[in-house]
Swiss-Prot record:
Molecular function via GO: catalytic activity, acting on a protein; histidine-tRNA ligase activity; transferase activity
Subunit structure: Heteromultimer composed of HisG and HisZ subunits.
Cited SUPFAM superfamilies: Class II aaRS and biotin synthetases (SSF55681)
More details: This function is generally fulfilled by the C-terminal part of HisG, which is missing in some bacteria such as this one.
Annotated HAMAP family: HisZ
Function: Required for the first step of histidine biosynthesis. May allow the feedback regulation of ATP phosphoribosyltransferase activity by histidine.
Subcellular location: Cytoplasm
Pathway(s) of this molecule: Amino-acid biosynthesis; L-histidine biosynthesis; L-histidine from 5-phospho-alpha-D-ribose 1-diphosphate: step 1/9
Record keywords: Amino-acid biosynthesis, Cytoplasm, Histidine biosynthesis
A GO BP entry: histidyl-tRNA aminoacylation
Stated name of the protein: ATP phosphoribosyltransferase regulatory subunit
Top-level taxonomic group: Bacteria
Length: 420
């Protein structure tokens, strides 16, 4: 029964000290940037009813959810996604729109063992709800680019894709649901050989414009030249409109001076089925991991109430932290500047002194040791060079200079002592 008591479940890990501080800083900087741009915060429970994620299209694989029962026998899940609970809130609360919201929290999704992915991650994101024009997508992309700049993330790019174009192709070529799952994988992984074999096995006419577009789809990545290629092969107004939307977003962001942070990839297809239009994926070159994901989901909120257009982007906080650790100087947690050793009957005075000293920007801590020598040893081990002793009769400041020496000694009043 105690076999696993010293281990973490698959796909989880402990975060210690500097890394915890860095995660907190990343979350706070993202939150601050989004709030400054007019987003309002929403928080949803870590646990949700299974039914929240089990509507008709089944956007999240049931096997990837952590499920258990509540006290009434109802199925509960650890939230595997942040967008769907937000859609539930907006759909059931009948919020006024347009609405810009931000969130941050942990997401739990069971990945395959040894896949190198964590099953618990931290996501911070934004959603623009109630707007169906390109201003919503543009707002989301600008917000995320600015937040990554403020975090000093280097060498990142956000790819703009269009799942609506892919869905138009699938519909026009009458590709069945089971076959489509394989097709999606071939395009996403840019597996040209398997895609070519798929077209051959399906006996699709390679002279047909839509088939040509399908075969080219994984190769359509880069800048606006990609759009020109796709437009030549678009065989319906719906396809042309889908391509034009990507073009409008790209051009608008480029004109703002953010062209170096964006690219087009019409072979990008999100694994979550609730996306209906433009989609986004962001990467950092050095780590090759996805740091941003999202897109337009105009039909999702309708599962919980009124049908509302919406678009959103999620930032993978853990991956950002990993990138910052690799790109920047090793993060050093702020050391304690002053340690206060006190006799128990001087606790109140010691705490007042701690409050006074920390107002000068110092990191000040009360000693946990009853013996002054133990406090000295702890201070040396942790590179603390100043110890203040709160004695019954006086306050004494010690400084390390190859040994502990008295720097000053004074009245019992912490205010007077600080001013000396």
């Amino acid at each position: 029964m105690t076999k696993w008591k010293r281990a973490n479940p698959n796909g989880t890990r402990d975060y210690l000290f500097e890394e915890c501080t860095l995660i907190e800083e990343v979350e706070q900087k993202l939150r601050r940037t989004f709030l400054e741009r007019g987003y309002e915060e929403i928080r949803t429970p870590t646990i949700e009813f299974y039914d929240v994620f089990a509507f008709q299209s089944r956007p999240i694989d049931e096997e990837k959810m952590y499920k258990f029962f509540d006290e009434k026998g109802r199925i509960i899940v650890l939230r595997p996604d942040m967008t769907i609970p937000l859609a539930r809130v907006v759909g059931t609360q009948r919020c006024d729109t347009p609405l810009k919201v931000t969130y941050s929290g942990n997401v739990f999704r069971a990945n395959e063992s040894l896949a190198g992915k964590y099953n618990e991650i931290v996501q911070s994101g934004i959603e623009v709800i109630g707007i169906d024009n390109v201003r919503a997508e543009i707002e989301c992309v600008i917000s995320v680019i600015q937040s990554l700049q403020k975090l000093r993330v280097q060498s990142f790019t956000i790819e703009i894709g269009q799942v609506q174009l892919y869905k138009c192709i699938v519909k026009k070529l009458s590709i069945h649901e089971e076959e489509e799952k394989f097709l999606r994988t071939y395009i996403e992984s840019k597996n040209y050989a398997s895609l070519s074999n798929f077209i051959r096995d399906k006996k699709l006419d390679r002279c047909d414009e839509t088939v040509k577009l399908l075969e080219k789809l994984p190769r359509l990545f880069g800048n606006l030249e990609v759009i020109e290629e796709a437009e030549k092969l678009a065989s319906s107004n719906e396809m042309k409109m889908a391509i034009t939307r990507v073009k409008e977003i790209y051009e608008a962001i480029e004109k703002l001076g953010y062209g170096s942070y964006i690219s087009i990839d019409l072979g990008t297809i999100q694994h979550l089925d609730y996306y209906t239009g433009v989609i986004f994926k962001g990467y950092i070159y050095e780590i090759g991991e996805e740091i941003v994901s999202g897109g337009r989901y105009d039909e999702l909120i309708g599962n919980f109430g009124e049908m509302l257009p919406a678009v959103g982007l999620a930032v993978q906080v853990n991956q950002i932290v990993k990138a910052l650790q690799e790109q920047q100087e090793p993060y050093e947690r702020k050391r304690i500047d002053i340690m206060i050793h006190y006799e128990l009957n001087r606790l109140a005075e010691a705490e007042r002194l701690r409050n006074l000293l920390q107002k000068d920007g110092k990191k000040v801590a009360l000693s946990l040791f009853s013996n002054l020598n133990d406090t000295f040893q702890f201070a040396r081990k942790n590179q603390i060079v100043t110890v203040v002793e709160a004695k019954s009769e006086s306050l004494v400041e010690y400084v390390w200079k190859e040994k502990w020496v008295v720097q000053k000694e004074g009245e019992t009043s912490c205010v007077t002592f600080k001013l000396r």
